[in-house]
Amino acid sequence: MADCAACHTGAGGTLSGGRAFKSPFGTIYATNITPDKTKGVGDYTDDEWVSALREGVGRGGKHLYPAMPYTSYTQMTREDALAIKAYVMTLPASSDAPPPNDLRFPFSIRFLMVFWNFLYNPDHRFAPDTTHDAAWNRGAYLAEALGHCQQCHTPRNFLQGLKTGQAYAGALQQGWMAYNITSDGPTGIGSWSEADVAAYLRTGHAEGHGAASGPMAEAVSYSLRYLTEADAQALARYVKSIQPIRTTVLPAPTHVAEDELGARIFEGACASCHRANGTGAQSAAAALAGDYTAADPDATNLVQIVVNGGKLQTQDGALVMPGFGDGYTDTELAAVANYTVEHFGQRAGHASPGLVAKARGSATPKVEQPGA
């Protein structure tokens, strides 16, 4: 549930590190957290491990950067933190060393994190809300601590601190839009049932709402698909209780002119899997009708998927969407993205060749996801 593998898995294997994360201040590389005693965390004491997870301070007082979600893990119990450590120590060790971080001055000075932590890391444990029952509190703990959901779904300020007053209202992360998951109807998941949310978490798909892609697909593949039914229901219950925050409302569906170039490309490259009517040929996850991403005029996530593809690993096997970045021009891919929004969302798409070019540039090296 803590989803360590999604960030720390690299070319050297599970938790070997090396994955790059771009920030406004430069690039941060995930560390090796395998049991290797030289390059990894094999000789960390329990106290050092817990300090790193909950306080963002590693061995020798070395401050971590908040690409590591310790501002959420700070709510984790010591028992859960040490359970993660016990599991990590059973995995194969790797001697891989990630590249050094490439951060601009003065952000390269780790000591400055003392002041950042003073502002943005509360360093407190999860406290149950006695006005709610045990299931709701279990869901709150999973979302706020272990699952660190706010780290992607809450917008950040200019110092990259979470804007807690806009919790779960959606944010752009690594070139992908983490959508509004508050209970707002038009712009959040107010129309989703708790069963829809639970199914989405465990399978990466909710009928009539769409399939997970990008970082959310990784979260499902590496972590959320292993949720027990009870935990998925608890998490869904908590998420559905989040106070609504209204963000940008999608335009009302209307008849719009469809991109002719995009229509031709869709027929030749997309319809065999997604079908012309968007119902999906081989899997419900391939359905475009009703999919929020396919109806979003900004087309941020849609363009990422079209250019770079994606993979969703479920308990029943892998669902793979190939990327088309190598076979089509920026203009052609923008056209097919706009056609998709226009045809299935009945809204004018705003994908541009520039957005496609940006998606090409944001692609990260593919790391093989776990098997079923």
Positions of predicted regions on the chain:
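C-terminal structural cap/anchor segments
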Residues: 261-300, 304
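Short cysteine-rich clusters marking metal-coordination/redox-active sites
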Residues: 4, 149, 270
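Flexible coil segments in periplasmic/lumen-exposed cytochrome c-class electron-transfer proteins
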Residues: 10-27, 59-140, 144-145, 154-176, ...
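Extended, polar beta-sheet/loop recognition surfaces of beta-rich domains
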Residues: 201, 205, 289-332
